[in-house]
Amino acid sequence: DEYEAAARKLASLLGIEFCDPTTFDAERLMYWPSCCSDSQYVYQVYDNPFCSLKGLLGMYGDWHDVSQWPQVPGADAIERRRLAKQEDPTTKRGIIGAFCRTYSITQAMEKFIPGMYEETDMQGRYTYTGGETTGGALVYDGDLFLYSYHSHDPCCRQLVNAFDLVRLHMFGDKDDEAKEGTPVN
C-alpha cells in the first residue's frame, strides 16, 4: 500500500501533470516505463539511494488517507466519463435491477457486508477495513455506485453497483472459475 502514496508524492515534487493516471498502479512498479515505438528508451542506473520511502511518506499528514494523495490534473474527468457511461442500475431488468432498486450502495454494505467499509468524516468516502489506507472508496451518483482505490478491496479499480459490490465481496472468488463470457445474471 505504500507504493502508490510514495509514487504520487514523488510525482507531485517532479511534476505530476506529466504523469499518466495509471502510473501509480502497483503493477506498474515492476515494469519499464513505456515510450513511442519509434523512439529509443534512455535510462541511467545510479547505485546511490534516490530518495527515502520513509521521507516521502513523512511528507503527508497521514499517508494512509487517500484524500491527501496528489492527483493528476484531469483525472477526475476520467471518473466522470466512466460514470456517464454507466447505465442506471435501478433501470436494469432481472435480478440485478431488482436488487439495486431494493438496496443502495450504503444499504447493501450495512445489510450484506457489515464492517467491510467504515464511513469517514468526508461525505461519500469510505474506508475498506481489510486494507491499510483510509477514505479510498467513493460513493457516486446518489448512492448508486462505488469506486474503490483500496488495493486489497475486491472492488479495487472498479465502478460497481450495489449488486456487484455484494457479489464481488461474497462470491468474487467464483469469478476465477467462470468461463469467459459467462453472463453475471
Stretches with model-predicted labels:
Residues 30-33, 125-129, 149, 167-169:
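Residues in well-ordered beta-strands of folded domains
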Residues 2-118, 142-146, 152-153, 160-161:
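DNA replication initiation modules
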Residues 110-135:
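Short, charged low-complexity linear segments at domain edges
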Residues 137-141:
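Segments forming glycine/polar-rich beta-alpha architectures that bind adenosine-containing cofactors
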